[in-house]
Amino acid sequence: MQRKDLEVINEMPFYFWVKDEEGKYIFVNRALADMAQQDIMGKTDREMGWSADAEGLRGDDKKVLETGKTLYVHEYAHVPGRGKVTLNVCKFLGEFDGKKCVSGISFVIE
């Protein structure tokens, strides 16, 4: 997968991201960027508005990296302007610009 292949994802109303093996965001779609209300690129969850939830989020990322298996979970995170929310999440192993990564797609459960 390459950055140019993901342009259609920017039009989708769900959150989509790609993280490198260190947990840094290397691609996010417009919905996630708008929700975060701060620059995400190159940062980890520990540096974001949902930093209190970073340990659990990173644990799920590591499971995918270690096993190579797709993970379907509910994650809990603090979303700026909304407070604590439950997210329905699918994380999967992939490749981005030639490097191993974890991609994810999620939406808030109302």
Predicted regions located by residue number:
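PAS/Per-ARNT-Sim sensory domains
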Residues: 49-66
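PAS and PAS-like sensory modules
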Residues: 60, 71-77, 88
